[in-house]
Amino acid sequence: MDNYQELRVQFAAQAVDRNEIEQWVREFAYQGFDARRVIELLKQYGGADWEKDAKKMIVLALTRGNKPRRMMMKMSKEGKATVEALINKYKLKEGNPSRDELTLSRVAAALAGWTCQALVVLSEWLPVTGTTMDGLSPAYPRHMMHPSFAGMVDPSLPGDYLRAILDAHSLYLLQFSRVINPNLRGRTKEEVAATFTQPMNAAVNSNFISHEKRREFLKAFGLVDSNGKPSAAVMAAAQAYKTAA
């Protein structure tokens, strides 16, 4: 008969392999959508025009939200026609779509590299503006001002650097969550953070974009230097998050 107590002791004595565990975390991470499938569907529905259409959908997602039918109620005639065409062409959905359906937010997340660059231009049209974020942390990094930014974070950065970037990004997510969800406005920072931490970590640990490419994006955005060290603005935002209420 097995000695279960002894087996328990023997198991506890086994080494903890950091690389192996981190690989499992990436494999088992929660994934709300498949970025590869999103791009596949965009190309399938859009043909030669998919890239230009995707940019339109990203701008809509950033400035108007994820419900195309509702946003059309307050929009110019030309805008309504454009959105209607996108809905029909790409079969855009709202709510909780299946793996094989597109939403505006999925397009923005799947193409996060362009999304984050567009934020620099669109920062004053967002639910939480760049000016508002500057009031919380001077020169707040515009590239961080959308949940899709998490997909650009390199999880292989040194621990302190990675934590600073995620804290800096969380400063925006904290404000964003309270603006778009009135039920969270009276909640503590910890309670609000609990609503965005899982999807943020899922995006960070996804394997759609390599660590090397993510590091290149972060450097191009001016968020880290060649050694992966966060910029002064990122560090300031990280500190602001730690002291935020």
From Swiss-Prot:
One of its GO terms (cellular component) is viral nucleocapsid. Keywords: Capsid protein, Helical capsid protein, Host cytoplasm, Host Golgi apparatus, Host nucleus, Ribonucleoprotein, RNA-binding, Viral nucleoprotein, Virion. The keyword Hydrolase does not apply. RNA binds at Y30, F33, K67, S105, R106, R185, T195. Residues 1-71 are annotated as: Essential for oligomerization. InterPro entries: Capsid_Phlebovir/Tenuivir, Nucleocapsid_Phlebovirus. One of its GO terms (molecular function) is RNA binding. It is found in: Virion; Host cytoplasm; Host nucleus; Host endoplasmic reticulum-Golgi intermediate compartment. The record marks W125 as: Important for dimerization. Transmembrane segments: none annotated. The N-terminus is involved in homooligomerization. Belongs to the phlebovirus nucleocapsid protein family. Encapsidates the genomic RNA, protecting it from nucleases. Displays high affinity for single-stranded nucleic acid. The encapsidated genomic RNA is termed the nucleocapsid (NC). The ribonucleoprotein has a non-helical structure. Serves as template for viral transcription and replication. After replication, the nucleocapsid is recruited to the host Golgi apparatus by glycoprotein Gn for packaging into virus particles. Homodimer. Homohexamer; ring-shaped, necessary to form the nucleocapsid. Homopentamers; opened pentamers in solution. Binds to viral genomic RNA. Interacts with glycoprotein Gn; this interaction allows packaging of nucleocapsids into virions. This is Nucleoprotein. It comes from Rift valley fever virus (strain ZH-548 M12) (RVFV). The lineage of its organism: Viruses, Riboviria, Orthornavirae, Negarnaviricota, Polyploviricotina.
